[in-house]
Amino acid sequence: MDLVLNREYYPGGTNGVLLQDASMLCKCIEPPAAYFKPLISCIAEGIYELELIPDNQTQRIRLFRCPNGIRSGIPIEVEISTITMERNIVPVSEITGEGRGTPSPKAWQNLLDLVGQALQQGEKATLEIRSYPENALNLTFHQIEWMD
């Protein structure tokens, strides 16, 4: 099962659309890189494998086998994790601003079910993260200048 996250970068955060077979599953947000550490990029574009991990009473989805070999274990969360300060991708019902939105537990659960079903059937689940620079300010290669 292949998922695609099409991103648009903004100074206040990243907005995106999560697709499967060109059909929209949900919208997603990511907090800006500066939210975590200066000069550290947000989750790098590339193709990631997805896995389910148990977490207390529920399961979580996380990205692993990251293209550059660092930052493995990035979670897809129900909401932005401000307590643990983790980088994460958050499914939302509505985008309300740059990297902001209304968290959607329903969208997150649907995604969890979809990934879980694929993995149980022995499929490999992947997430390709990409962007279209013409749609928004793309900070992938210019982030250091933006942060100065």
What are these regions (language model features)?
Residues M1-T126, R130-D148:
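Cell wall/extracellular polymer interaction/catalysis modules
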